[in-house]
Amino acid sequence: MKIRKSTLSDESDVKALWGYCFEPPTDPFFQWYFKELAKPEEILVGENQGSIACDLHRRPYDLSIRGLRYPVDYIVGVATHPAARMRGYAKELIRGEFHLALKEDKPFVILMPSAASFYLPMGFGFYAHQWERSAAPERLAALGRRAESCRTLTSSNDWKDLASIYREYTKKRNGWAYRDEKSWEKHIDAQLLEGYIAVTYDRKGPSGYLFYTLDDRKMIASEMAFKNEAGRKALYAFMAGHQGSVDTCVWYEPLDDHSFRYWQDGAEHTYIKNRTFPFMLGRVIDPVIAFDGLPCSKEIKGEIA
């Protein structure tokens, strides 16, 4: 199988493969993705006997790890033509991505797996875990506190409000993606195709935001960020305000969050489900670039035998 970057002449085949495996061409996200985001040079294809057997999309990101900035490929849309499956083509293509990332001095590649068991034998490992929490909206009311004000976004014009929250939320954490104006606009536009964005405010300005969808009487918050505890409680109150509209709210918070220890009346596992949820895989491509000069926390103590 020949592995190469796609060209404009591959566009119809690439779209057809995405449409078969993911969203159909009539889906708004499909149309937006291939108009605004996908670039031929960021798509890797596996060609067999003159036809595209498989492909993957390489979304470029910069991650913050211990204060250093690393360029990475975020792999999405791994797809194999139905007539070419069960032949190991996708794994061969992913290994081709490893070689290309190494050539481009990218120390890691990352992805969000639909089936982790497919990727683990290729050297991937979970590097990001989070809390998955769910509760009936009326139960969240006891933990929330109404914001000074709240609104839902209808465009990416107010991206700076979200950026200020995200910056505060991530500043002491690792593995988060750098976002500039252009990436924020794309991120917001993609969310508004399929769902909603709520922003809460206190007297000082933006305090929290929520990316969410409503489907089958369930609210699912795919991204949540806040500047402080008041911002978190404001988002809880926003979700609680959907009593009568939804039966369940599902949201995610970072693994270093210990707020559940202070929930009232033994809420954890009683009326708020709280479980760890691994969700991102990473694979080290170049250990030297990845670890050379990486600082360690001054709080770490110990000896090397």
Predicted regions and their residues:
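Conserved active-site alpha-helix within GNAT-family acetyltransferase domains
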Residues: K103-P107, P113-W131, D256-I272
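A short, internal acetyl-CoA/4′-phosphopantetheine-binding micro-motif in the GNAT/acyltransferase core
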Residues: I75-R85, S114, K218-E229
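Short amphipathic alpha-helix that is part of the acyltransferase structural core
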Residues: M1-P60, G67-Y74, A141-K182, D215-S222, ...
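Intrinsically disordered, low-complexity, positively biased terminal segments
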Residues: R146-A305
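Conserved GNAT acetyl-CoA-binding A-motif
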Residues: I94, H99-P113, G244-P254
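Conserved acetyl-CoA pyrophosphate-binding loop and the N-cap/start of the following alpha-helix
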Residues: A84-G96, A230-A234
